[in-house]
Amino acid sequence: MDRTLESLRHIIAQALPHRDPALVFKDLNVVSMLQEFWESKQQQKATFSSEGLVVYESMPSSGPPFVSYVTLPGGSCFGNFQCCLSRAEARRDAAKVALINSLFNELPSRRITKEFIMESVQEAVASTRGTLDDADDPSTSVGAYHYMLESNMGKTMLEFQELMTIFQLLHWNGSLKALRETKCSRQEVISYYSQYSLDEKMRSHMALDWIMKERESPGILSQELRAALGQLEEARKAGQELRFYKEKKEILSLALTQIYSDPDPSSPSDDQLSLTALCGYH
């Protein structure tokens, strides 16, 4: 623990040289510190675009408690975990959670290395009650995770978050299973989706999947949305990374909106990501 704290102080001294490491998390100006931290990273590595480095979102509310989310470069999302009586307080609290995670992300243990991959795969095998042989089988979820980690060697876990979230969503809405049935390999799926960001286009495509599910099983959308809202709130109050839960909520809400506003939301669009394009390899 002492070694971790010392590493954090060193990271703060490097990334925020004008700040006192002992006072960083007590400073009310944590919003500007978070921005300063990621601007410093961009200057050092030129990893992310300068547009929208750190994005905040306040949830509509007529009164307290207020909820605020902050999305970081690379796709990770955090929210305020305390009960906040003002929007400004919620924004500061979300920024504090994001800053703590951003600093921890700089620790050597958070970078994807061979040792990190080995430990992560072992944890995945244990959680799925599988075997280590699954890690070498790209048709399994553990094998796909192993392949994704190896494809992102050298990145930190926050930099890897967006791709990870995309595949969590594809698994959740059944797309991975559908692709497996069309004989698309997981490597092809990973290579294909690595080209895309999780944007409105991808959300619209996934919302269409859920509209089809609603037609087959009326009521499933509302059921999934209630579950997603509960998961999001629970994870936020625990100070956890939120992107997967938040995207589920956004996609399901979009699907419900389209059902009530568009008489034929299943009409294909040139803007939608096409699984046919992916499976056209075969």
UniProtKB/Swiss-Prot annotation:
Pfam family, one: LIX1
Family of the protein in this entry: Belongs to the LIX1 family.
Organism: Mus musculus
Name of the molecule in the record: Protein limb expression 1 homolog
Disulfide linkage: none
Record-linked InterPro entries: Autophagy-related_EPG5 (IPR051436), LIX1 (IPR029270)
